[in-house]
């Protein structure tokens, strides 16, 4: 979920690979899997609570989709992702129900100005978030979800950014 506060700042959560296979850290949006019986909107609301303690948010439509493959915590994932936009009052209570792997992987939660995200281009998940976030912050929601599936060069750049060598 790309969630904005009233000042158009976006919430990002610092992440690290607890297995140490992915060097460095990154900043990611709240999100996770879709449980049986859920649609993507229901899963988005649940994940906002689990990962950020956000209980009140105006959830918008799915704005981005992507297919990604990655390894995290020693597990390989191959998944389709449906990313919604949301607005909230900026109140986060901290994680409300992290799974064990998330509890050892997640660090600081921070509201970033979109200007800082674009200027500093931190390593993010989704990989291509920086390319598309300004439109969402300005309220420009696409009529249909945009496919932001990373290409090989996006993944290589992301990996290189976390490698201190």
Tell what function each PLM region has.
Residues 1-28, 56:
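N-terminal strand-loop-strand
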Residues 34-58, 66-125:
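Unchanged
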Residues 93-165:
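Nudix hydrolase/Nudix homology domain
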Residues 14-16, 63-68:
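Generic short beta-strand segments
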Residues 18, 71, 131-133:
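A generic membrane alpha-helix/interface feature
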């Amino acid at each position: 979920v790309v969630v904005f506060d009233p000042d158009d700042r976006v919430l990002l959560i610092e992440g690290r690979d607890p297995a140490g296979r992915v060097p460095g850290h990154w900043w990611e949006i709240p999100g996770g899997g879709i449980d049986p019986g859920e649609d993507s909107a229901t899963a988005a609301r649940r994940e906002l609570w689990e990962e950020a303690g956000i209980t009140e948010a105006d959830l918008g439509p799915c704005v981005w989709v992507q297919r990604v493959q990655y390894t995290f915590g020693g597990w390989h994932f191959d998944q389709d992702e449906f990313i919604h936009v949301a607005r909230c009052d900026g109140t986060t209570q901290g994680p409300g129900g992290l799974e064990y792997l998330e509890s050892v992987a997640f660090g600081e939660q921070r509201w970033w100005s979109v200007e800082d995200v674009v200027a500093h281009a931190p390593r993010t998940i989704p990989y291509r978030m920086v390319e598309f976030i300004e439109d969402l912050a300005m309220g420009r929601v696409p009529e249909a979800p945009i496919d932001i599936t990373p290409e090989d060069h996006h993944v290589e750049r992301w990996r290189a950014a976390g490698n201190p060598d």
